[in-house]
Amino acid sequence: MAATFFGEVVKAPCRAGTEEEEEEEEQSRRDTPEDREVRRQLARKREVRLLRRQTETSLEAVLLETHPCSKFIIAVGSNATAFLSAFVMNSGVWEEVGCAKLWNEWCRTTDTVRLSPTDVFCVFYQLKSDPSVFLCQCSCYIAEDQQFQWLEKVFGFQPRKSMQVTVLTCRHITDYKTPESTCSLSSPFLRALKTQTFKDALCCPLLEQPNIVHDLSAAVLSYCQVWKIPAVLYLCYTDVMKLDRVTVEAFKPLLSSRSLKCLVKNIPESTEILKKLMTTNEIQSNIYT
């Protein structure tokens, strides 16, 4: 039986959970003290830490519990972060309030203070003119076992239901499930998925079943659904997953959304900044320079 709305839990009879628990118990009986120590060291290495990048000191409290938050915008992936850099962060003064430092099989966040489009990072900013507005640019991969840690340290266990969350991310068009051939689709294109408490108008069609979302974006939306926080995910399906100007500009319909339109001032200037970002990326990606 399929779920009828986002967040519905559909239970099916299955012995897999019991068998997995039995296997874990058997494994723990076979483990030597050295095995357990290796596991502890690996778990410690995979911890997600929130800190101030300039001083490398840990944040003492949950990020959004320290500051009142009315609006939280999260960009996941290089194209989504480039969109925020060009069209949103250009229109105001943003102050860095922290970053997530993490390690996993696919990425290691950078320690550099001056970030470039090719760096791997997860940085949080606060709007100086309205300190209740927060923004996160996350170009790194956050593994499944690290996502709850990230949510715990950013949102906490008692998040404010008065805030609104907007998430931007991309997936390859081959992940889009449709009766038609994906070759006939004009990419890039946007789809949206929202929590039940999100009531604003959407900037694109809703994501059709049986499509699903993945990774940190899915974790954030699930968290907001559970805590009844108004949230929307805008998913851009594209055939180019590297930094790409056409894919970045596919997010432009969001500039008229309630959460972003008050943050954007000069679109022509933002377009020029996007061109410079693309040029910088091309230079850094060229093995001959």
Curated annotation (Swiss-Prot):
Belongs to the PSMG1 family. One of its GO terms (molecular function) is proteasome binding. Forms a heterodimer with PSMG2. The PSMG1-PSMG2 heterodimer interacts directly with the PSMA5 and PSMA7 proteasome alpha subunits. Residues 27-38 have a biased composition (Basic and acidic residues). It comes from Mus musculus (Mouse). The modification Phosphothreonine is found at T18, T55. Chaperone protein which promotes assembly of the 20S proteasome as part of a heterodimer with PSMG2. The PSMG1-PSMG2 heterodimer binds to the PSMA5 and PSMA7 proteasome subunits, promotes assembly of the proteasome alpha subunits into the heteroheptameric alpha ring and prevents alpha ring dimerization. The keyword Transferase does not apply. Highly expressed in testis with moderate expression in brain, liver and kidney and low levels in heart, skeletal muscle and pancreas. Residues 1-38 are annotated as: Disordered. Its main location: cytoplasm. The modification N6-acetyllysine is found at K265. GO terms for biological process: cerebellar granule cell precursor proliferation; chaperone-mediated protein complex assembly; proteasome core complex assembly. Degraded by the proteasome upon completion of 20S proteasome maturation. The modification Phosphoserine is found at S181. This is Proteasome assembly chaperone 1.
